[in-house]
């Protein structure tokens, strides 16, 4: 019995060491090379086989300097305005979210951009305690080995922005027919507006909630830009989608 326990303990130690070495290796690798594929991309694509429509993987990696500064500003304002101040965990935001969630049915999150990057690059989408623990682990590794600019670059290249669409460049080409470096503040704010839940909120079919959120983000990113008085900002500055083009052709 004792020998079995010793053997099991050795295997556990080996498994833990293997996980630590391999995870650290991938984190260090992605510090320098583009992320080719993520678990989320695979899970979404495979699960769509049994759905109404197959969803492929559309992505196009670009360096941070080829993404419009307005996109970076919009994402920071919408998701993590203290990104350059914290070390991966925003404890003030966590405390505020806990207080808010005690009195509201709609729960509020406090994940930082680094935490979202850790989840998007290395983990699965379903929420559970194991994933949250691993998310914290990868967040610490990322913050310890990547500069903030690299974290932002990876984040903007792997985030889900519609069915089968990953990264700002792929979203820019699909929805706006332009590269990410040519996005204007309106488009950048619309992209940031769907980030809380890109499966529920759509860039090509924005709800009133998304449009309202877009306005608030835009006010923070570019307060000097004139705002629309009526329902939507989508008529401004070439905000024309495939769906609108299809309707006009019919």
UniProtKB/Swiss-Prot annotation:
For this UniProt entry, the molecular function terms from Gene Ontology, in alphabetical order, are: pentosyltransferase activity; peptidoglycan glycosyltransferase activity
- Name the major location: membrane
EC numbers listed for it are 2.4.99.28
State the reactions this protein catalyses. Answer: [GlcNAc-(1->4)-Mur2Ac(oyl-L-Ala-gamma-D-Glu-L-Lys-D-Ala-D-Ala)](n)-di-trans,octa-cis-undecaprenyl diphosphate + beta-D-GlcNAc-(1->4)-Mur2Ac(oyl-L-Ala-gamma-D-Glu-L-Lys-D-Ala-D-Ala)-di-trans,octa-cis-undecaprenyl diphosphate = [GlcNAc-(1->4)-Mur2Ac(oyl-L-Ala-gamma-D-Glu-L-Lys-D-Ala-D-Ala)](n+1)-di-trans,octa-cis-undecaprenyl diphosphate + di-trans,octa-cis-undecaprenyl diphosphate + H(+)
Alphabetized SUPFAM superfamilies for the sequence? Lysozyme-like (SSF53955)
Q: What residue ranges are annotated as transmembrane?
A: 15-35
- Which domain of life, per UniProt? Bacteria
A biological process from GO = regulation of cell shape
Instruction: Give the Pfam families listed for this entry.
Output: Transgly (PF00912)
Question: Which pathway, per its entry?
Answer: Cell wall biogenesis; peptidoglycan biosynthesis
> What enzyme category does the UniProt record give?
transferase
Subcellular location(s) per record: Cell inner membrane
| Record-level GO cellular component terms | peptidoglycan-based cell wall; plasma membrane
Kindly give the membrane topology term recorded for this protein. Answer: Single-pass membrane protein
Q: Which UniProt keywords apply?
A: Cell inner membrane, Cell membrane, Cell shape, Cell wall biogenesis/degradation, Glycosyltransferase, Membrane, Peptidoglycan synthesis, Transferase, Transmembrane, Transmembrane helix
Question: What's this protein's function?
Answer: Peptidoglycan polymerase that catalyzes glycan chain elongation from lipid-linked precursors.
Q: What is stated as this protein's family in its record?
A: Belongs to the glycosyltransferase 51 family.
Q: What is this protein called?
A: Biosynthetic peptidoglycan transglycosylase
Q: Which organism is it from?
A: Bdellovibrio bacteriovorus (strain ATCC 15356 / DSM 50701 / NCIMB 9529 / HD100)
């Amino acid at each position: 019995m004792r020998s079995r326990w010793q053997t099991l303990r050795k295997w556990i130690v080996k498994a833990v060491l293997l996980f630590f070495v391999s995870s650290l290796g991938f984190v260090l690798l992605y510090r320098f090379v583009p992320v080719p594929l993520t678990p989320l991309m695979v899970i979404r694509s495979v699960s769509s086989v049994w759905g109404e429509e197959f969803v492929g993987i559309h992505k196009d990696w670009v360096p941070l300097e080829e993404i419009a500064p307005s996109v970076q500003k919009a994402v920071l304002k919408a998701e993590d305005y203290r990104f350059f101040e914290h070390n991966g965990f925003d404890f003030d935001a966590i405390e505020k979210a806990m207080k808010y969630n005690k009195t509201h049915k709609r729960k509020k999150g406090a994940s930082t951009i680094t935490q979202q990057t850790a989840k998007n690059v290395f983990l699965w989408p379903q929420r559970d305690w194991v994933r949250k623990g691993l998310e914290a682990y990868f967040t610490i590794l990322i913050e310890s080995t990547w500069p903030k600019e690299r974290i932002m670059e990876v984040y903007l290249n792997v985030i889900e922005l519609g069915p089968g669409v990953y990264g700002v460049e792929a979203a820019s080409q699909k929805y706006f027919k332009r590269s990410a470096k040519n996005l204007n503040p309106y488009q950048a704010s619309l992209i940031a507006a769907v980030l809380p839940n890109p499966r529920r909120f759509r860039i090509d079919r924005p709800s009133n909630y998304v449009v309202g959120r877009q306005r608030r983000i835009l006010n923070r990113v570019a307060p000097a830009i004139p705002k629309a008085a009526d329902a939507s900002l989508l008529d401004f500055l070439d905000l024309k989608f495939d769906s609108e083009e299809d309707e006009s052709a019919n």
